[in-house]
UniProtKB/Swiss-Prot annotation:
Removed propeptide positions: 23-71, 1111-1355
GO biological process: extracellular matrix organization
Task performed by this protein: Type I collagen is a member of group I collagen (fibrillar forming collagen).
Protein name per Swiss-Prot or TrEMBL: Collagen alpha-2(I) chain
PANTHER family registered for this protein in UniProt: COLLAGEN ALPHA (PTHR24023), COLLAGEN ALPHA-2(I) CHAIN (PTHR24023:SF568)
UniProt biased composition (Pro residues): 276-290, 1080-1091
Modified sites of kind Pyrrolidone carboxylic acid: Q23, Q72
Keyword Metal-binding assigned: yes
Originating organism: Aquarana catesbeiana
Domain annotation Fibrillar collagen NC1: ranges: 1120-1355
Localization: Secreted, Extracellular space, Extracellular matrix
Binding site for Ca(2+): D1168, N1170, Q1171, C1173, D1176
A Gene Ontology cellular-component term: collagen type I trimer
Length: 1355
């Protein structure tokens, strides 16, 4: 399918090419309206809306566990039923009702697949009007015709098209006042007037729909520590034994049966005063009170609804002429008017409609050569060639350089667990964990005793006087409602009328509280109090309903490397590779066998003369005597040729790392942690359901005048106005611009050919000739382009208001406009409706008890009251006596899930357990919450050219473009043949009387022409320019790896390559044992109140009262969110405990990585020695065979060249390379993107974490001595190294500061390049890395040096 964008591009290009290549072709009819444009990019997110009204109350919460009746009766006295007791006082609120609480908002879902292309959008707005055409060539002036005889009166012609604007006449007399002009455009908003007097309060408006649920307010600061919860049942106190040695963890025993319930403890002391009971039912309405004093005037109310239209006003004065309105639609053709006075000869008419489509023009020039297309896909591998003839065995090559570190081998199977290792020291304290998620809703707590009575609050200001609502009809009698929680304090009743003054009676004794009366009828609404001060921040609301899925999030981060693909097909043999980069240091190999003996060295220098011996007697020639003492060592021989590489040595003995011990016993639960920090603001909740519509409000005051609305649709033509006074003839106007050439009319009848006269000289322009006879009416030409707007006409009479146009189709959503300036201060609005009831004030002092009212009729069931405040902790009951343990029974079948136990006292802090084994990958967590809308993305890169689109359906006709300029006068066409008389049209409205024109000459009677037919539609346009390329598509999945191809020819040995990248992450290990139970999270928010319980009734102590309501709790709802959160936290903790060596999860040292992943091989990994933020992690090479962490220099090679020429004849001395020769730049060790300062910090930590360090430097030489001078046999020309703590490392001297040489190829001046490998190992890591080197034997024109700086390795 062709996309919509392509179609638009095709049409645009078609129009462009058509205009370029077809200048001579006449213009076709105006094309249909183009298809709508693409939807613009998303606007900038708007400002947050104002907080909506509070939503309706949520559904009731889940039922709480039953209360514990243990302290309310004594089982020892329960054998006989007691007498029916009197009705007890109203019980505490019952357990919550059954509907469950609203779940937490789900985690955000994964991004959905891209949706299918949507349907074609609605038609877009009309395109902009086209440019005006170029002026035509000026026509020749016609010859003046002879004046013909006056013809007979012609038939009444059709009303002519309006002529061009006439010349400006002489200023006429002032006409009489015209009719009232059309209303002008809205004026600029005037300044705010002074505030008017307060209007009388309007009637209460209809209750507005509930606003959207307001945002969850910011979390309050951590509250003071709550009162302790009720203590659990006290167990028998055992003697405190001495702490035993930790034993091995035993196997978990089978779950024991529940022991028999213990006897009830003695009755506890009387509890504190109970909570206030629920408000009693309303008593009967009292007599009306005395009329109250007048309330304070209320603030100005909000603007009311627009009032009913007023009566028509008096006619206004004449309005300023409005701007010319848009042309109305053509009226129906009017009846033929009376013949007008013959007008002067009109100018050439406007250009007619385009003629029929001409023949297709010649093909346009070929376009430019297209851009080079993208590279095609790689071709499939060719077939493998035939195997070549086996070559002759080559001679044995020299030993190659150390190979690169091999790729990561497949993970080995997990070894068996070893014996438990010795207990390690306690690890460092871990970082504080992230604040936990909001806990699940807690079970309702036990009712506490009442707090002390609060102080009497200050008197509130007087409220707005409310209007009494109409009394509703009495509802049907409902079932008795359950007792709700105490409701908020009701409003004051209206003052009653003055009663007759009674005689004062004697004060009676205070009566006993009477029984609760039945609910009275609802009293009339009291007067509204004055607006109270803003209440404190309310508690966080219950979690909102599940939000709709959010929009697709931004592209996620790059995913982890995919799993290894399946082997691909054999590839063709590769060509010889280029010389590779320097490889990472290989793992230390075992010692090789001794190489063959080197060639004999040169003879040593002759030894010194021995002491003169005593002369001996001449003896016989003896046999060979024993060998004499060894001579003085000869000069150092040249290095022998390297021996062949020895076989790999046997594996060394196992290291000290023990096998992981068995899992330790589960430690006791830790103490509850402090409450976490306040959570961030929650997402904005959904709007609550719409409330019932209220009573219609009173008519509001008229609003301020609104800004000018958009121009309405053009109304129908009004009735003709009365004829104005004839104005005096105006002055001649300036010459109009040249009109466009009219399209030629059809050919007229051939005239008789006159004799051709000789060309005379051009005469001067003659006077205007008389009008020639009118030609026959030609076929109507096509409608020309709209002319330029004429000068504004006089304001005509305003027509009647047209019918409202149909609603236009909704335009596409525009981009967000810039934020407007703050509006001017508006006038104070009228007094608003009475606000919702403010929070209850503090309880006033208790009044004297009233006399018991008569029992009212039982009221309808009330709505559930708000939850009361939590009471203080009750006194703990006394300890029960210990029951004897029963005999062990057989193991029963699994019982139903028991109720959650009460929170135990915190146990002692357990020892840190050893790290658990790797867990299995967790299941996917529930979808996360919707992310916030992303900011508007930047404009994407241009996309590739899309395929050509199909031609769209013709759009609706566009609106008329602006009038074009007047064209130059065109040539007159020849008269056309007479047309057939057309049907007479309906009579049009009489036009206003025009200005009297000059008397015209009589024209000949013309025949009536035919109506022309509508021209054909123009050709479809050529393809448009290519659209902007679309956004880059998502990367394809990695294809499978092919099988290993045949080996290519051996390349030349490369340089030592740099260290390779770290291998792919190994497979996830088996799941480790569960960790110790973490500290309890902060307490969750209190649960919503439940439904009230049934009435207590009489108490009957039946037999065996050992059952509690809490033994059969209703099934606890599954808490998937908590499970998913715990699983996610476990995974995050495992990631922290077992670092991956990645940039996001670096280890501290390579040793930590090896301990966490013993199966991993050496390679590059990320570490963060100073811990903390991972943004300064460094990439290092981990040598797991030696346990070293190696940091490379940057750069690690110094160019080999002549760095210094000694121009003086002074003796040579050591010159520091970095400080003197290299412009003050010493050797540096830091990653790209990491500053030297950050790297210095990491190196400082690395030195603290290590107790050994080593580094080597390769000195490349040409005619320069690095270590041993072969001529002198001494080390006086050896280089000096500078350590990181400014210590100088030399070839000889103190052994702690001397380096060793692994290979010395720079012992004499040979004119060839050689190298010397220097190594320094130390138990003082602070001396490394090496920062500078000072050679001595340099300065000659033929002396060149360079360096390779090896990695510094810490262990």
């Amino acid at each position: 399918m062709l996309s919509f964008v392509d179609l638009r591009s095709v049409l645009l290009l078609a129009v462009t090419l058509y205009l370029v290549t077809c200048q001579e072709v006449r213009r076709g009819p105006r094309g249909d309206k183009g298809p709508p444009g693409e939807q613009g990019p998303p606007g900038i997110p708007g400002r947050d809306g104002e907080d909506g009204l509070p939503g309706l109350p949520g559904p009731p919460g889940v039922p709480g566990l039953g209360g514990n009746f243990a302290a309310q009766y004594d089982p020892s006295k329960s054998a006989e039923p007691g007498q029916q007791g009197i009705m007890g006082p109203r019980g505490p609120p019952g357990p919550p009702g059954s509907p469950g609480s609203q779940g937490f908002q789900g985690l955000p879902g994964e991004n959905g697949e891209p949706g299918q292309t949507g349907p074609v959008g609605s038609r877009g707005p009309s395109g902009a009007p086209g440019k005006a055409g170029e002026d035509g060539h000026p026509g020749k002036s016609g010859r003046p015709g002879e004046r013909g005889p006056v013809g007979p009166q012609g038939a009444r012609g059709f009303p002519g098209t309006p002529g061009l604007p006439g010349f400006k006449g002489i200023r006429g007399h002032t006409g009489s006042d015209g009719q009232k002009g059309a209303p002008g455009a809205a004026g600029v908003k005037g300044e705010n007037g002074a505030n008017g007097d307060n209007g009388s309060p309007g009637q209460a408006g209809a209750r507005g729909l509930p606003g959207e649920r307001g945002r969850i307010g910011p979390a309050g600061s951590a509250g003071s520590r709550g009162s302790d919860g009720s203590s659990g049942p006290v167990g028998p106190a055992g003697p405190i034994g001495s702490a035993g040695a930790p034993g091995l963890p035993g196997a978990p025993g089978a779950k024991g049966e529940l022991g028999p319930a213990g006897n009830n403890g003695p009755t506890g002391a009387a509890g504190g005063r109970g909570e206030p009971g629920p408000p009693g039912s309303l008593g009967p309405a009292g007599p009306p009170g005395n009329p109250g004093t007048n309330g304070v005037n209320g603030a100005k109310g909000t603007a009311g609804l627009p009032g009913v239209g007023g009566a028509p006003g008096l006619p206004g004065g004449r309005g300023i002429p409005g701007p010319a309105g848009p042309a109305g639609p053509s009226g129906a053709r009017g009846l033929a008017g009376d013949p007008g006075i013959a007008g002067g000869k009109g100018d050439t008419g406007s250009k007619g409609e385009p003629g029929s489509v001409g023949q297709q023009g010649p093909a346009g020039p070929s376009g430019e050569e297209g851009k080079r297309g993208p590279n095609g896909e790689a071709g499939s591998s060719g077939p493998s060639g035939n195997a070549g003839i086996r070559g002759v065995p080559g001679t044995r090559g020299l030993p190659g350089p150390d190979g690169r570190a091999g790729g990561i081998g497949p993970a080995g199977s997990r070894g068996s667990s070893g014996p438990p290792g010795a207990r390690g020291p306690n690890g460092d304290a871990g970082r504080p964990g992230e604040p936990g998620l909001l806990g699940a809703r807690g079970l309702p707590g036990f009712s506490g005793s009442n707090g002390p009575q609060g102080k009497e609050g200050p008197a509130g200001p007087q409220g707005i006087e409310g209007r009494s609502g109409a009394a509703g009809p009495a509802g049907a009698r409902g079932e008795p409602g359950a007792i709700g929680f105490p409701g908020p304090k009701g409003p004051n009743g209206e003052p009653g009328k003055n009663g007759d003054k009674g005689n004062q009676g004697p004060s009676g004794n205070r009566g006993a509280p009477g029984p609760d009366g039945n609910n009275g009828a609802q009293g009339p609404a009291g007067l509204g109090g004055a607006t109270g001060e803003k209440g404190e921040q309310g508690p966080s609301g219950a979690p909102g309903f599940q939000g709709l899925p959010g929009p697709g999030g931004p592209p996620g981060e790059v995913g982890k490397p995919g799993e290894r693909g399946a082997p691909g097909d054999f590839g063709p043999p590769g060509s010889a590779g280029t010389r590779g980069e320097r490889g990472a240091p290989g793992e230390s190999g075992g010692a090789g066998p001794h190489g063959p003996s080197g060639s004999r060295g040169p003879s040593g220098a002759p030894g010194p003369d021995g002491q003169k011996g005593e002369p001996g007697a001449a003896g016989l020639n003896g046999g060979l005597g024993p060998s004499g003492p060894a001579g003085i060592p000869g000069e150092r021989g040249t290095a022998g040729t390297p021996g062949t590489k020895g076989e790999k040595g046997d594996a060394g003995n196992s290291g000290d790392y023990g096998n992981p011990g068995r899992d330790g016993a589960r430690g006791p639960a830790g103490a509850a942690g402090a409450p976490g920090p306040a959570g961030g603001p929650g997402d904005r909740g959904e709007s609550g359901p719409a409330g019932p519509s209220g009573v219609a409000g009173p008519r509001g005051a008229p609003g301020e005048r609104g800004e000018a609305g958009p121009a309405g649709p053009t109304g129908f033509a009004g009735p003709p106005g009365a004829a104005g006074h004839t104005g005096a003839k105006g002055d001649r106007g300036a010459k109009g611009p040249k009109g466009e050439a009219g399209s030629p009319g059809p050919l007229g009848a051939h005239g008789s050919a006159g004799p051709a006269g000789p060309n005379g000289p051009a005469g001067s322009t003659g006077a205007r000739g008389d009008a020639g006879p009118s030609g026959a009416t030609g076929f109507p030409g096509p409608a020309g382009r709209a002319g330029a707007p004429g000068p504004p006409g006089n304001v005509g009479p305003s027509g009647p208001t047209g019918h409202p146009g149909k609603d236009g189709s909704r335009g596409p959503r525009g981009d967000s406009g810039p934020v407007g300036r703050p509006g001017e201060q508006g006038q104070h609005g009228p007094v608003g409706l009475a606000g919702d009831k403010g929070p209850s004030g503090e309880a006033g002092p208790a009044g004297p008890p009233g006399a018991a009212g008569p029992s009212g009729v039982l009221g309808a069931r009330g709505i559930l009251g708000l939850p009361g405040t939590r009471g203080e902790r009750g006194l703990p009951g006394g300890p029960g006596s210990n029951g004897e343990p029963g005999p062990s029974g057989l193991a029963g079948s699994s019982g139903p899930r028991g109720p959650p136990g009460s929170v135990g006292s915190p146990g002692p802090v357990g020892h840190s357990g050893e790290a658990g084994r790797d867990g299995h990958p967790g299941n996917d967590g529930p979808p996360g919450r919707d992310g916030l809308p992303g900011a508007k993305g930047e404009r994407g890169y241009p996309g590739n050219t899309g395929p050509s689109g199909l031609a769209g359906a013709p759009g609706p006709a566009g609106s008329a473009g602006p009038a074009g300029k007047s064209g130059n006068r065109g040539e007159g066409g020849p008269s056309g043949p007479a047309g057939i008389t057309g049907p007479s049209g309906p009579r049009g409205p009489a036009g206003p009387q025009g200005v009297r024109g000059d008397k015209g000459e009589a024209g000949e009677r013309g025949a009536r022409g035919l109506d022309g037919r509508k021209g054909h539609n123009g050709l479809s346009g050529l393809p448009g320019p290519s659209g902007t390329p679309g956004e880059t598509g998502p990367s394809g999945s990695v294809g499978p790896v092919g099988p290993r191809g045949p080996s290519g020819p051996s390349g030349p040995p490369g340089k030592e390559g740099r260290s390779g990248h770290p291998g792919a992450m190994g497979p996830v290990g088996p799941r480790g044992p569960a960790g110790f139970t973490g500290p309890a999270g902060p307490p969750g928010p209190p649960g919503p109140p439940g439904h009230a319980g049934p009435s207590g009734g009489g108490y009957d102590g039946g037999d065996g009262g050992e059952y509690y309501r809490a033994d059969q709790p209703e099934r606890k709802p599954k808490d998937y969110e908590v499970d998913a959160t715990l699983k996610s936290l476990n995974q995050q903790i495992e990631v922290i405990l077992t670092p991956e060596g990645s940039r996001k999860n670096p280890a501290r040292t390579c040793r930590d990585l090896r301990l966490s992943h013993p199966e991993w091989t050496s390679g590059f990994y990320w570490i963060d020695p100073n811990q903390g933020c991972t943004s300064d992690a460094i990439r290092v090479f981990c040598d797991f065979s030696s346990g070293e962490t190696c940091i490379h220099a940057n750069p690690d090679e110094i160019t080999q060249k002549n760095w210094y020429i000694n121009t003086s004849n002074k003796d040579k001395k050591h010159l520091w390379f970095g400080e003197i020769l290299n412009g003050g730049t010493q050797f540096e060790y830091h990653d790209e993107g990491l500053t030297a300062k950050d790297m210095a910090t990491q190196l400082a930590f690395m030195r603290l974490l290590a107790n050994q360090a080593s580094q080597n430097i390769t000195y490349h030489c040409k005619n320069s001595i690095a270590y041993m001078d072969e001529e002198t046999g001494n080390l006086k020309k050896a280089v000096i190294l500078q350590g990181s703590n400014d210590v100088e490392l030399r070839a000889e001297g103190n052994t702690r500061f001397t380096y060793s040489v692994l290979e010395d190829g720079c012992t004499k001046h040979t004119g060839e390049w050689g190298k010397t490998v220097i190594e320094y190992r130390t138990n003082k890591p602070s001396r490394l890395p090496i920062l500078d080197i000072a050679p001595l034997d340099i300065g000659g024109h033929d002396q060149e040096i360079g360096f390779e700086i090896g990695p510094v390795c810490f262990k």
